Every structure is written in structure tokens, then in C-alpha cells.
Amino acid sequence: MKLGIVGLPNVGKSTLFNAITNAGAESANYPFCTIEPNVGMVTVPDERLDFLASIYEPKKYTPAVIEFVDIAGLVKGASKGEGLGNKFLSNIRNTDAIVHVVRCFDDENVIHVEGGTDPKRDVEIIDLELIMADMEMVERRIEKANKNAEGDKKYLHEAEVFKALLEHLNEGRSVRSYECAPEDMELIATSDLLTIKPIIYAANMDEDGVADYENNAYYQQLCAIAEAEGAQVLPICAKLEEEIAALEPEERDMFLEELGLSQSGLDRMIKTSYSLLGLISFLTCGPDECRAWTIKRGTKAPQAAGKIHTDFERGFIRAEIVAFDDLKSCGSMAAAREKGLVRSEGKDYVMNDGDVTLFRFNV
């Protein structure tokens, strides 16, 4: 899974990326300090995997990972190549979802390229650039469909679908907010459009603001925007998260406890990303390795096996599965077997989040 972190210059985007990866990407008080996208692989916190590792004490511990890409700052006119616009658009096209960092704090020492703090204006600037880029893509798709329709009339419907979408985009609305028949949306999804991507708005506040975020006027403004398009908002203080990320694990837990938090804002972002993209994890365990594997919700057992190795899917026989909670209550796989909690599932079994799995195959 790849998430692109976007935002106008000086909204806290690179600070948040530093916190996410603890990579120390240059964070400077001027536009375009992030010219090439910084990429960081982040482990997904999973207490279930930690528990399995405590039982098996494996040689290798492999959590699921998310790839975060810190994408260059954006300005008005990016869709026409202003600033670093073309680079921005090509980099964001390669992501699965967008984390849009929106400034929700006042600080006269940190210059805002558009003037004062205004979440609605900032969201509209980036949305407009992405929508304009999508309009260009859709216009090309209509042109291609019309040309193909000369030899095959089925393309007439495709042209009509994209013409209707173009009208929607012309109104300044994203593909995410577009409603149409499921089969038409499947067709639209083949076009690699930017505003179809799921989005999380990261409301970046100062420490005082995030401590009482529900009463933060900027946060409330951003929530209203997100609600209108079915997006999610995460209150976060990027500077605080950067400090937390720099601590050792034990110190981190103590610091969070002092703040009255059960988890960091980054952990919440990762979990929200999983939910947003419809992802779950299944687990494999043994003395050699305990590992979490990421799959789409609704994935069947053979395809899940294929995530481990193509031979597992090709020669799939069955999956031996125990729900994590059952395994934990029993204390071991052997005890779970004795209680008859380990099930044998066939090729039509749909995987559940937290399934502890052993695949049987023959090639």
C-alpha cells in the first residue's frame, strides 16, 4: 500500500513525513524544500503479531508495511506546470490513497504561501489542480472512445459515461463525489484519475489546538468539507508526532500516557488508511517467522496464499485457520487444535482480519 502525503508549502507536510518515517527529511520554511519525493516504509502496529512472536520467539519478525511518499509542495497552476506541478501530478498518480495535510494553526513565524490560515481555501486549491488534471485525462478518454466508436458501437456508451463525468468535474467536484451505475464506475476506475483516490485529511494543529481539537474552528471547517465528500479527518500535531517518533519505544509509551493518549496520531492514521482502502491482515507463525500479510477485504483463501508464493495459490489444497482471539485464549496452536478451534477451509473461504493461517498446497 502506498500513501501520498500532499499539501501546500509550509502546512507541516514534511514534518509529518519525518514523524511517520523518523527519516529526517529536510523540513524548511520555504516552498519546494521537498523537490524529489521522499519515500519511507512504515511498519503497521499489530498487537496480535506481537503476541504470536512472544509465543514462538521466531528467528524473524515481519509486520505489514505501508509506503509513505512525501510529494513536492503544490501551488496554484500546478496542473498547468506551475511550480513543481507536473512532478507533483505524476508522483501522486502512483499512490493508492492521499493524505492531505491541511494547516489548522496560526503561526506568524511560518509563512503561508496564500496568506493566513484558511482550510477551505487550501483544500480548494489542491482539489482544483487535481480536478483540472482529471479533466484533461477525461477529455482524452472521450476523444479516444469517439474514435473507437467508428469501428465498434460499444464505445459510444463509454464516451457518454465520460462526458457525464466531465460535466461533474466542470462543476469543481471530485470523482469521489460522483454517483453512477456500478459498471460505469468500474469503467471510470480504469482511467487512473487523481480525484477518485480515497483521501484522509490530516488537520495539522499546534499542541494547544490538538488538545481541544473538537472546539478548534479550523478543524470544524475541515470536517464540514470532508463530510460533504465522504472523506475522513484526523486531528494531528505534526511537531508533537515528530517528537514522539524520535523517542525509544518505552519512552514513547510513557510520553503518550502522560498526554492521556492510548496511541499516537500516526498509529491512528495507519489504521484509518487500512480501513479506507478496505485492507485486512492475516497472520502466519512458526519458529522461523511470524508475519502479517496485507490483503483486500473479501479475498479468498487461494489468493491470500498467493501473497506468500504463487505456488501456494497454484497448488492450493486447503487452509488451516484459527481466529486470533481463539488462539490467544487457548495460549497456543496445539491447545487450539485440542479444543477443535482450528478449522480446515477450502478454496471458497473468504479470509477474515486476524486469521492465523497455515496453507496446505501441492505442486
Regions found by a protein language model. Name each.
Residues 1-111, 127, 139-140:
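Conserved G1/Walker A P-loop phosphate-binding module
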Residues 2-6, 11, 17, 144-350, ...:
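C-terminal-of-GTPase-core extension/linker across diverse P-loop GTPases
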Residues 23-31, 38-40, 48-51, 80, ...:
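Glycine-rich, flexible loop/turn motifs
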Residues 32, 46-49, 62-68, 82-96, ...:
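Amphipathic alpha-helical transducer elements in NTP-driven molecular machines
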Residues 40-45, 72-82, 93-155, 168-181, ...:
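Conserved Switch II/interswitch segment of TRAFAC-class P-loop GTPases
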Residues 92, 351-352:
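Short, well-ordered loop/turn sites that connect or cap secondary structure elements
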